[in-house]
Amino acid sequence: EVYVFEEGGEVQGFIGMDAEYIAGLFVAEGHRGQGIGHQLISEVKRKKRLSLHVYEKNTGAVAFYRAEGFRVENSMTEKETGEQEYLMVFHDGNCD
């Protein structure tokens, strides 16, 4: 599934989901810091659990996901790139 944030006929951001896994979240560079990422994350928080992978060095993204209630569950080396990455998860407060 893909959720798109569009305004004035212009796609400004989108989030791609594979069941409860966030495959990607992108906000156009000129539209960052305007709450678009928050709105997209809020849309998929209907799910009980969400997970994603993010590079450890992408400190802006890590901080964004932490602010949205995600926590680091695991740290690993990504096989193809050799980069350190985090598995981050979000649990709905209403579930165990």
Describe the function of each predicted region.
Residues H38-Q39, K57-Y86:
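Conserved active-site alpha-helix within GNAT-family acetyltransferase domains
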